[in-house]
Amino acid sequence: MVDLDGAKSGSRVNAAIVKEVAEQSGMRIEMGGGIRSMEDLQAVDAMGVWRMVIGSAAVTDPNFVKEAVRVYGDRIAVGCDALNGEVKTAGWVEGSGLDYVDFAKQMESFGVKTLIFTDIATDGMLSGPSFAALERLQKAVSCQIVASGGVSNNEDIRKLKEMGLYGAIIGKAYYAGTIDLAQAVADGGSQDNP
């Protein structure tokens, strides 16, 4: 889940909805959007969210990531959103000057175990993930890598699985009906719920 309102406003306006989904779904909920401080993490944790995704703040405040990992361990993931290899922040509009692989290595050195990689150029395009960029990232770090952006069909899921990626985020493909979700779970596998 991404709390777009929280990302914009810096407040948890969707807290009740997120908490309800966490309580009633029986699934591990992963959420990002506007997580900028330890207080934000505490609030998101209180909603029942299992994995908390730090995005732009990982670039602007690396010490926050260190503290988050110290307190929450592998429940912290970092979003790595890149365009032409450069990490972008602030809703993908600000350049950071950081190469996505160098950024991933830095996050790994802080103890981050899960990276969510979005190639901005493919997000929402149903054109397939950026397999080459994902392969480069996978060779550079030992983190669990989740592919986000461009996943368009079940063949993409099978290829990501063959590459050894930890997971994939399916968005537009589900809403557009270009992927069979049950088959995607069967092909890609799933992490066990607690």
Question: What feature does the model see in each segment?
Answer:
Residues M1, I29-G33, M52-I54, I76-C80, ...:
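Hydrophobic faces of well-ordered beta-strands that scaffold small-molecule active sites
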Residues M1-N14, S56, I116-S127:
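Glycine-rich, proline-tolerant flexible connector loops at the mouths of alpha/beta enzymes
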Residues R12-K19, P62, V93-D102, S127-R136:
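Charged helix-capping and loop-helix junction motifs
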Residues I17, S25, I29-W50, A132-G167:
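Catalytic cores of alpha/beta
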Residues V21, V44, A68, Q106-M107, ...:
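Generic structural signal for hydrophobic
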Residues I35, Q42-F64, D119-A121, G149-N153, ...:
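Glycine-rich phosphate-binding active-site loops on the catalytic face of alpha/beta enzymes
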Residues Q42-D45, V49-D123:
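Conserved anion-binding
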Residues N84-G95, M125-G128, E135-R136, Q144-S148, ...:
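Active-site-adjacent loop and "lid" segments of alpha/beta metabolic enzymes
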